[in-house]
Swiss-Prot record:
<dbReference type="InterPro" id="IPR006566">
    <property type="entry name" value="FBD"/>
</dbReference>
<dbReference type="InterPro" id="IPR055411">
    <property type="entry name" value="LRR_FXL15/At3g58940/PEG3-like"/>
</dbReference>
<protein>
    <recommendedName>
        <fullName>Putative F-box/LRR-repeat protein At3g59160</fullName>
    </recommendedName>
</protein>
<feature type="repeat" description="LRR 3">
    <location>
        <begin position="233"/>
        <end position="258"/>
    </location>
</feature>
<feature type="repeat" description="LRR 4">
    <location>
        <begin position="336"/>
        <end position="367"/>
    </location>
</feature>
<feature type="domain" description="F-box">
    <location>
        <begin position="12"/>
        <end position="60"/>
    </location>
</feature>
<dbReference type="InterPro" id="IPR053781">
    <property type="entry name" value="F-box_AtFBL13-like"/>
</dbReference>
<dbReference type="InterPro" id="IPR001810">
    <property type="entry name" value="F-box_dom"/>
</dbReference>
<feature type="repeat" description="LRR 1">
    <location>
        <begin position="172"/>
        <end position="198"/>
    </location>
</feature>
<dbReference type="InterPro" id="IPR055294">
    <property type="entry name" value="FBL60-like"/>
</dbReference>
<feature type="repeat" description="LRR 5">
    <location>
        <begin position="368"/>
        <end position="393"/>
    </location>
</feature>
<feature type="repeat" description="LRR 6">
    <location>
        <begin position="408"/>
        <end position="433"/>
    </location>
</feature>
<keyword id="KW-0677">Repeat</keyword>
<dbReference type="InterPro" id="IPR036047">
    <property type="entry name" value="F-box-like_dom_sf"/>
</dbReference>
<feature type="repeat" description="LRR 2">
    <location>
        <begin position="200"/>
        <end position="225"/>
    </location>
</feature>
<keyword id="KW-0433">Leucine-rich repeat</keyword>
<dbReference type="InterPro" id="IPR032675">
    <property type="entry name" value="LRR_dom_sf"/>
</dbReference>
Length: 464
């Protein structure tokens, strides 16, 4: 048996010979619970824990499924008990907060890079008497990355100091079921990345604008489920912004009744990447995407608009039930574009004109049997430099006069053939097909013979 401290005579414990700074760096890649367990090794390791620059706390990591056991870290003064899933949450609350308190006390005022806290429970809310002091402590220590995933429920508010911190570079707030946050005063001069999920604002669109105005160096903004669709207007106006993810699709997947947002504006002249998912707005007063390189667009009509389309489309030509023209014109400089099936439908019924995409070289089309390709040909004709065309699925809706949706692989193949014959500059065509539905492989394989010599056709079966 090789001794844990000596591999052979004269050898040394290589790990213990490493400098403290390097060991602290290694510990920073572990969860705080894992890092704390190293304190059992020796007094030196407990000392190192006091200087770990990254702290990550997750209350779900403190649940044991079989029985309530005494945690050996308790003997080191770090934690009380680890409880079973069957134990009451109330008992757990005396263990996990105690662990966080002891770690923060152990570290004192040493510099801190990242503080991550996840406390999510479907039954009991977070105790604000515990969380608020933790946030204050790490902000005083100059934390640069603050990551909070919390079920707030009855928690009155986030500490206002979060939005008045000169050291924060990255801020993530995922607050479920909490009250609106108050952002009357915002001063985040170094903030580069802001990630908000399920966050509501006390003054809705005004509060959101105040928050952005207090972040003069912001480069990346991620918004998920912030309920902007119920605001009077929504404006993302940040001159320094380079990446924007704006996904307010909570009602789409919940099957809730949707209403069109009134006004949505984007004044982001330096933006290079956009991911936008939302029901179409009534108006897009300002769309400034002068530097945009890549865009992923998933916009859709409300159920009321879809019903109107189904009724009028049988008897009328060029039916328009909304206006997303300004948004589509605003992204005309992109090089890489991904459009959802719903967006294709918006182009058909809510876009008076499709602009010329002079820089577009790569297009990805997501297809579904519920949505047609009526606008696709016009889009491709207006993309003179297109080199790569990707179809994710070949099925789409073909509506006849009687309103019956006919789905046949032959119809899709004919349209793809047409794309190949009319796009001489195309260099690559990628087809993601469902082999259980798009069963006629012979027709798919024939596409290669129709393409120009420089166009590569790639067939990729979808994994189910």
């Amino acid at each position: 048996m090789v001794d844990s401290k000596r591999m052979d005579s004269g050898s040394k414990d290589m790990i213990n010979d490493l400098p403290d700074a390097l060991l602290c760096h290694v510990l920073s890649y572990l969860t705080t619970k894992e890092a704390a367990s190293t304190s059992l090794l020796s007094r030196r390791w407990r000392y190192l824990l006091a200087f770990v620059p990254n702290l990550e706390f997750d209350d779900s990591a403190y649940l044991h499924r079989d029985k309530r056991v005494k945690n050996p870290l308790h003997e080191k003064g770090l934690v009380g008990f680890v409880l079973t899933v069957d134990d009451k949450r109330k008992k757990l609350s005396t263990s996990f907060p105690d662990f966080v308190d002891r770690i923060l006390d152990l570290q004192g005022n040493s510099p801190l890079d990242k503080f991550s806290l996840k406390m999510v429970d479907d039954h009991d809310p977070v105790d604000p008497d515990c969380v608020a002091p933790w946030i204050h402590k790490v902000l005083v220590r100059g934390v640069s990355d603050l990551h909070l995933v919390i079920d707030m429920n009855e928690w009155t508010s986030l500490p206002a100091k979060i939005f008045l911190t000169e050291t924060l570079v990255k801020l993530t707030l995922k607050i479920r079921d909490g009250p609106p946050i108050d952002v009357k005063h915002v001063h985040l001069p170094k903030l580069k990345t802001l990630h908000l999920e399920s966050v509501m604002f006390d003054e809705e669109d005004i509060g959101f604008s105040k928050l952005l105005s207090g972040c003069p160096e912001l480069e990346e903004l991620v918004l998920h489920h912030i309920w902007s669709c119920v605001w009077t207007s929504c404006s993302v106006s940040v001159a320094t912004l380079k990446r924007l993810t704006f996904c307010c699709n909570n009602m789409k997947f919940c099957g809730m009744h949707e209403e069109n947002p009134n006004n949505v504006s984007f004044d982001t002249p330096n933006l290079v990447y956009l991911e936008y998912a939302e029901v179409i707005a009534n108006n897009y007063p300002k769309v400034n995407f002068d530097s945009l390189v890549e865009a992923k667009i998933d916009i859709w009509m409300t159920n009321d608009q879809l019903d109107e389309v189904r009724i009028r489309d049988i008897y009328e030509k060029n039916v328009m039930v909304g206006n997303a023209t300004d948004l589509i014109v605003g992204i005309r400089n992109v090089r890489v574009l991904c459009l959802s099936a719903d967006t294709l439908e918006v182009l058909t019924y809510c876009c008076k004109q499709i602009p010329i995409f002079n820089n577009l070289t790569h297009v990805t089309i997501q297809s579904t049997p519920k949505v047609g390709w009526k606008s696709l040909l016009k889009l491709l004709k207006n993309s003179p430099k297109l080199q790569t065309l990707v179809f994710q699925g070949l099925l789409h809706r073909d509506t006849k006069e009687e309103g019956v949706a006919i789905i046949k692989i032959e119809k899709q193949i004919e349209k793809v053939k047409h794309f190949l014959e009319t796009m001489p500059h195309l260099e690559q065509l990628v087809l993601h097909y469902d082999s259980s539905i798009d069963g006629d492989m012979k027709q798919l394989l024939m596409l290669s013979s129709l393409a120009s010599p420089k166009c590569k056709v790639q067939l990729i079966p979808l994994v189910t």
